């Protein structure tokens, strides 16, 4: 309890609590700061570094803790690191039980899976697919954007990272977003010139992506 309170007091937006999760502990913490880790191996929750089988289902965990947390990190343990795809149906079962934030992990290995999870309002935690370059982050990010709504362009609001002041409104196509993510410098699409342009190339006033 003291460690959790200290981490939150030091500015953590969220903390993840796994084996230690209990009604007593969670009731003493601000629930908007808490994600409960549910580690599932073949349909049963495992704790203590995945070494202890509890015999409890993930569904029971959600019913038990749903009023005490902000959301869940749900890991399919038997799929973790295998690069064979995750268990989408098991994850969707959890989605049906809660409206809270849900992050899925374990075996996610393709952009199609990421898109399917996103469609169901489920975030993806990626590991091995990034390390092995099976999925590139910039490709995954772009896949979540709907470029077709406005003739392959999306409005891009540019904001100062420190002051939060809105600096400009520009438009980006997929190539502009990809270049921005790869180079770290803001690149947009000029509708008047019908071409990409990187802010600051001539003036030197670059916009760095943070």
Language-model segment annotations:
Residues 1-14, 26, 89-124:
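Catalytic cores of alpha/beta
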Residues 15-19, 75, 80-83, 103-107, ...:
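Glycine- and other small-residue-rich loops at beta-strand/loop junctions that grip anionic moieties
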Residues 23-36, 114-143:
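C-terminal helical cap(s) of enzyme catalytic domains, especially alpha/beta-barrels
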Residues 30, 66, 96, 118, ...:
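Anion (oxyanion) recognition and catalysis
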């Amino acid at each position: 309890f003291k460690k959790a309170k200290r981490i939150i007091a030091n500015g953590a937006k969220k903390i993840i609590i796994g084996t230690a999760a209990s009604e007593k502990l969670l009731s003493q913490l601000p629930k908007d700061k808490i994600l409960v880790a549910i580690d599932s191996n073949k349909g049963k929750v495992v704790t203590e570094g995945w070494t202890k089988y509890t015999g409890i289902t993930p569904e029971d965990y959600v019913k038990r803790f749903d009023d005490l947390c902000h959301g869940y990190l749900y890991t399919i343990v038997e799929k973790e690191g295998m690069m064979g795809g995750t268990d989408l149906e098991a994850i969707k079962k959890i989605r049906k039980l809660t409206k809270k934030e849900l992050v899925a992990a374990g075996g996610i290995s393709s952009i199609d899976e990421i898109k399917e999870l996103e469609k169901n309002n489920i975030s993806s935690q990626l590991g091995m697919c990034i390390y092995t370059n099976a999925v590139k982050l910039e490709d995954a990010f772009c896949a979540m954007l709907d470029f077709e709504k406005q003739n392959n362009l999306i409005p891009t609001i540019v904001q100062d990272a420190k002051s939060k002041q809105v600096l400009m409104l520009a438009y980006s196509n997929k190539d502009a977003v990809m270049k921005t993510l790869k180079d770290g410098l803001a690149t947009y699409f000029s509708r008047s010139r019908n071409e990409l342009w990187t802010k600051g190339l001539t003036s030197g006033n670059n916009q760095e992506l943070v």
